[in-house]
Design a protein with these regions (language model features):
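Basic, glycine/lysine-rich polyanion-binding surfaces/domains
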Residues: 1-134
Length: 134
């Protein structure tokens, strides 16, 4: 079943997480080391859909730890409080003028995706925020 807008859902075996960010678009978050991710995903989901591999266009950064929310709140304009941005929530936002997808995958863990050309800039923004918070 597809998740509601800005939520995620996991496959039965937890190997694939689906993110719903737009009405007609779902992103699949999973680990796969082959060269045919589209075929792999199609066989795993067994659902009639179009699949496009976009893994080479994204830089992914995980921010985790007891103060991870404090670090991200300095650069993220959305409400990351645990009551609002619960585990499993996903959203598109702008962080430090950079388009970003943020996914909360644990109590103190967030996954950030940004266009790969902005990866170093995003990492720098996170490091500066961490230096100011920690």
């Amino acid at each position: 079943k597809l998740p509601e807008m800005e939520y995620s859902t996991e496959s039965k075996d937890s190997s694939i997480t689906l993110w719903r960010l737009q009405k007609n678009q779902v992103l699949a978050y999973f680990t796969y080391e082959g060269h045919d991710a589209e075929s792999h995903l199609s066989s795993q989901l067994n659902a009639p859909a179009y699949y496009t591999d976009q893994s080479d266009t994204w830089a992914m950064i995980r921010v985790s730890g007891k103060r991870s929310r404090d670090v991200l709140e300095r650069i993220c304009p959305i409400d990351l409080s645990p009551e609002v941005f619960t585990v499993g929530r996903v959203s598109r936002t702008i962080m430090e003028h950079i388009g970003t997808i943020i996914f909360r995958d644990g109590d103190d863990s967030y996954v950030l995706l940004t266009m790969r050309s902005f990866g170093r800039s995003m990492l720098h923004a996170i490091e500066v925020s961490a230096d100011n918070v920690l």
